[in-house]
Amino acid sequence: MNDRIEIRANDWIIRVFRFQISNFPSHCLSMPGKQKLISWNVNGIRACIKKGLRDFANWCEADFLCLQETKVNPDTIPDEDFSFAWKTFHSAEKKGYSGTAVFAQEEPLAAQEDFPPADHAGEGRAITIETQDFFLVNTYVPNAQGGLARLPYRMQWDQDLRAYLQALDKRKPVILCGDLNVAHEEIDIARPSANRNSPGFSDEERSGMTHLLEAGFVDTFRHLHPDEPRHYSWWSYRAGARARNVGWRLDYFLISERLVPCLQDAFILSEVHGSDHCPVGITLDLDKL
């Protein structure tokens, strides 16, 4: 009895999910000669699978699918039928917390967990993939927490991540994606005045993003859509925030400046449900590199 009810519920969710993602054929269809990368904070991969993640992953035909906040333990990694040739999970030492994953259509040259110094290990927050043409860094940036209690650690993280990306960039172009846990400018948050100095919109965190862009990286969405308001990637579950589009743009793709000529598209799939975040993505034409 419970199984039948659960199946019907899942089928209903998946039908809604398919209807919603069908609004994005230009973003989610394979294009010869192009690289498509999608990032999504799934807020628990097992829960998101029940809400249609597998269907989305198999249907959107991304070359790389990067997930954050997977909340899965190494001994319980889901063996789902995703249409990717290669995958890696990086789990936190604390069970049911944080975590990142990367799915790829082809096996990369190398994969690395975390980044120096070792202070940042243990929470499963970063995976670096090396391909022939670029480094891809998938990250789930620490939240500064209530009262900005973890802001000093967050500031150190931002500084160390910036140095790491700059070192990679000397070797190959870099793509950084993930939940960066900051709304950079007022245009990136529905209610900037009410959230001044809240976690994710503090002056310090916003400055950290500014320093990263000044270090030679480009916010792909703002590069192509510099003045478009009301584009968000996270909404609180409270008070119908998503239905009213009272959100924050916390999820990004940043690229090395020399990849800008390759940038074909940057998009936010705000109608795709399954998490309190929605997927974001880019399309690159690496023939222009």
Regions found by a protein language model. Give the residues of each.
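N-terminal, active-site-proximal structural segment of metallo-dependent hydrolase catalytic domains
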Residues: 23, 27-82, 86-88, 92-98, ...
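Metal-dependent phosphoesterases centered on the DNase I-like endonuclease/exonuclease/phosphatase
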Residues: 64, 84-86, 157-250
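Active-site beta-strand/loop signature of hydrolases that rely on acidic residues for catalysis
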Residues: 41, 57-75, 136, 165-186, ...
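Conserved beta strand-loop-helix elements of the APE1-like EEP
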Residues: 95-111, 239-261
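Active-site-proximal beta-strand elements of phosphoester/diester hydrolases
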Residues: 35-43, 133-145, 177
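Surface-exposed cleft-lining segments at the edges of enzyme active sites
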Residues: 116-117, 141-158, 193-198
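Structured beta-strand-rich core segments of catalytic domains in phosphoester-bond hydrolases
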Residues: 71, 77-144
